[in-house]
Amino acid sequence: MESLTLQPIARVDGAINLPGSKSVSNRALLLAALACGKTVLTNLLDSDDVRHMLNALSALGINYTLSADRTRCDITGNGGPLRASGALELFLGNAGTAMRPLAAALCLGQNEIVLTGEPRMKERPIGHLVDSLRQGGANIDYLEQENYPPLRLRGGFIGGDIEVDGSVSSQFLTALLMTAPLAPEDTIIRVKGELVSKPYIDITLNLMKTFGVEIANHHYQQFVVKGGQQYHSPGRYLVEGDASSASYFLAAGAIKGGTVKVTGIGRKSMQGDIRFADVLEKMGATITWGDDFIACTRGELHAIDMDMNHIPDAAMTIATTALFAKGTTTLRNIYNWRVKETDRLFAMATELRKVGAEVEEGHDYIRITPPAKLHHADIGTYNDHRMAMCFSLVALSDTPVTILDPKCTAKTFPDYFEQLARMSTPA
């Protein structure tokens, strides 16, 4: 297996313009495909997940052109639900941001489409979404294991009264929200359980509004959506920088700044993961906000005990930042980590122990006490981009760290290690 050893880093300084947000990129692509008119998307993320969405749209007859660097996409909308000419199988890798929204959108009208992906995708639950779509009339079959992909979709979704479990993934609700306006009937969506990663629902609602559709949101417990609507292209749309990707650089600034400035997100960002900067501030770093930037300056870091339900992806970065904080850090209400690219709670606990931390892994929490000195270790990444990027921070000590399968960052940030090196002064 390929590996990358990062030597100790004495200081991190400078600015980075972030690649486009994965969450925003894939939502914007799907809405542009469903909309009337042509949309020009700029600062689109070039990553595995986005390529899977683009390949699927192409197979469904959507025409688009990409710039040479794949960050600008001119896409001609279908002016309504996507149609397959004949039976079709779409391979979506391990892209949850493609699988969940497409599973819903392709239940409109009469299609026969199979959605499948990598082995890990077949372990990521989708049963709550399928249950909700069936309540709205959709015909869906599980082809292997009950409640998991691959799925066969045969249309039939018309809307109506629907319940969705919000406790596992907000992507299920996102998928229903984006699909419901195109259903023939009005839809009332009721959320059961505590809604995880609520800020991601705000991204969805924001983007739908940009494409001309507004829905009634009753305290995130009930959403009322008029049927028979159309999305309309906004013309041009700039994809915000990825706030989850910003977390690694901001944390590096907190641990070994200098000052690190990330551009492409700021106080006006719609992504909940910008709140990661507030957590660093609580830990002792100095944060400066602009409309389209966030800067972080080193501080003496101390442990925190916090509910991280609102920023589950960026919270992973706090787990490795905790190695540099005084005291024991506890991250709570993060069960959602278990159903991501890998079981992130298990993976994080396992790899933190390798570098010497004392770790308690609970059902939905993790407690981390740093060692007096970090140990060199070979870090397993579990084909999870965030594991690779989180553990790069170990090099901000006086100990090297070896990252196994470093290219797994291609899911959201193909040149992450080059960018980190550019801003780093070796010890």
UniProtKB/Swiss-Prot annotation:
Q: In which pathway is this protein known to take part?
A: Metabolic intermediate biosynthesis; chorismate biosynthesis; chorismate from D-erythrose 4-phosphate and phosphoenolpyruvate: step 6/7
- State the family it belongs to: Belongs to the EPSP synthase family.
What is the superkingdom listed in this entry's lineage? Answer: Bacteria
Its chief place of residence is: cytoplasm
Subcellular location per the Swiss-Prot or TrEMBL entry: Cytoplasm
Function comment: Catalyzes the transfer of the enolpyruvyl moiety of phosphoenolpyruvate (PEP) to the 5-hydroxyl of shikimate-3-phosphate (S3P) to produce enolpyruvyl shikimate-3-phosphate and inorganic phosphate.
According to UniProt, the reaction catalysed is: 3-phosphoshikimate + phosphoenolpyruvate = 5-O-(1-carboxyvinyl)-3-phosphoshikimate + phosphate
Specify which residues bind phosphoenolpyruvate according to the UniProt entry for this protein: K22, G96, R124, Q171, R344, R386, K411
Q: What class of enzyme is it?
A: transferase
What Gene Ontology molecular function terms does this protein carry?
3-phosphoshikimate 1-carboxyvinyltransferase activity
What's the subunit arrangement here? Monomer.
GO cellular component, as recorded:
cytoplasm
The name under which this protein is listed is 3-phosphoshikimate 1-carboxyvinyltransferase
- Biological processes per GO annotation: amino acid biosynthetic process; aromatic amino acid family biosynthetic process; chorismate biosynthetic process
Q: Source taxonomy lineage?
A: Bacteria, Pseudomonadati, Pseudomonadota, Gammaproteobacteria, Enterobacterales
Any idea which UniProt keywords this protein has? Amino-acid biosynthesis, Aromatic amino acid biosynthesis, Cytoplasm, Transferase
* Keyword Amino-acid biosynthesis applies: yes
Residues annotated as catalytic: D313
Q: List the EC numbers from the record.
A: 2.5.1.19
